[in-house]
Amino acid sequence: MKRFGPYLIFAAAMLWATDAPFRVHLTKDLSSNFIVLVEHFFDVLIVLPILLMNLKVFKALSLKQWGAVLFIAIGGSALASVAFTQAFHYVNPSVAILLQKLQPLIAIGLAATFLKENFNSKFWLWTILALFGAYLISFAGFKAQLFPGETLNPNLMGVGLALIAAFFWGGSTVMGRYMLSSVNFKVMTSLRFTLAFVFLLFMNLYQKSIPQLSTVTKTDWLFLLIVAITSGVVSLFIYYKGLETTKASVATLAELGFPMAAVIVNWVFIPNSALVWPQIVGMGVLLFAIFSLSRYNQQQAIKASKISLNSN
């Protein structure tokens, strides 16, 4: 299973991008905070049986472990999304997206500090390749392109918010790997959704962003349910199953499946949106890097097992 862990994370990250066509419809009439709240409500309904069957596990968690769970649920699920969205009010989308590409490097740094993960020269080679591939996918012209009507606006507040989002997302990968040494992937998923839902509920009530439910159409409810299942609970089950056997430093690079899938989804669903050759090359480079990182992850696991056996 250690060999397939990075592939599961890559597949989960690609699922995160499938909600784009539905969100385009939903954001026309509903606030982003309310959309995320309802998604988490549906997700909590699905994971509630798991939550109830594992109450003893929750009682056994240490203060440090609860801190990690809260970081993931509040930081990774809520605050990161809010910070990244707010960054667009201060800087151009292209600047925010470019800064978000620092997320893997932040996660690698946290993995080295918090989890004491070690890296060899091969890891850094595949890391550079993966980041280069992701960069080509997002910026096919080899440089960060401004969107129509944009002018360069490197506002310090916007830069800070984008980096905060990258920190929370990168940190959530590391904290998730830490927690999975104590709980299984199903318990981790249920914890994340439940605590995030409670936080989002209070945030929506405070900001008064919950609309009259009568104004939410049947199509809205259907799309919210689809998003909650596909890019929500299903993708996180797959993600945490993969993270159980994957180093956090490898996992954060496997998450680059998200920008690749986002470009493909745009190509399929947005009229006159075409894939250009740098993006196709970037996809090939990224896939090769993920394949190589998967082998690296397996080799590191075998090495760790041998060291453990010898020490015993």
Where are these regions (language model features)?
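Helix-helix packing/entry segments at the starts of transmembrane helices
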Residues: A11-A12, I35-V38, S77, S81, ...
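Glycine-/small-residue-enriched transmembrane alpha-helix faces in small-molecule transporters
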Residues: M1-V36, I74, F147-Y178, F202, ...
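Transmembrane alpha-helices of multi-pass small-molecule transport proteins
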Residues: D29-L79, I106-L110, F168-S172, T189-K208, ...
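Membrane-interface helix-cap regions at the ends of transmembrane helices
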Residues: F22-H25, D29, D43-S62, F132-L152, ...
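Juxtamembrane helix-loop boundary signature in multi-pass membrane transporters
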Residues: M1-F10, L105-F167, M283-N312
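Loop-to-transmembrane-helix transition segments
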Residues: F4-A12, L51, K59-A83, L156-A165, ...
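Specific transmembrane alpha-helical segments of multi-pass solute transporters/efflux pumps
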Residues: T18-F22, L55-S94, L99-Q100, L136, ...
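C-terminal transmembrane-helix exit sites in multi-pass transporters
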Residues: I46-N54, Q103-I128, F132, M260-I280
